UniProtKB/Swiss-Prot annotation:
List of glycosylated residues: 40, 75, 82
GO CC entries: extracellular region
Domain UPAR/Ly6: 22-99
Designated name of the protein: Prostate and testis expressed protein 14
Signal peptide: 1-21
InterPro entries: LY6_UPA_recep-like
Source species, domain of life: Eukaryota
Species: Rattus norvegicus (Rat)
Family: Belongs to the PATE family.
Quaternary organization: Monomer.
Amino acid sequence: MGKNILLLLLGLSFVIGFLQALRCLECDMLNSDGICEKGNSTCEAKEDQECGILVVSQGVDILFGMQDCSSHCLNKTFHHYNLTLDFTCCHDQSLCNEF
């Protein structure tokens, strides 16, 4: 009987852990040191969202970044003249879009 209760509790803990919502870091303006200067908070990703981060750089110098819950997230890097825009998405764990 004790084993059955233990297995039931273990199964429930897995279900509860699985059902926890994905939380993402949210920042409207990350400076070049990765410090949020505007809009520092977290957001709860909806069903069609994941955590996203955008880092804009020029050569090896990071200019600024942004973090959010994103519906249209892509893992892609774009080059435009001398600027690089690096979009990264994640959904494997909460707060995974850390700078």
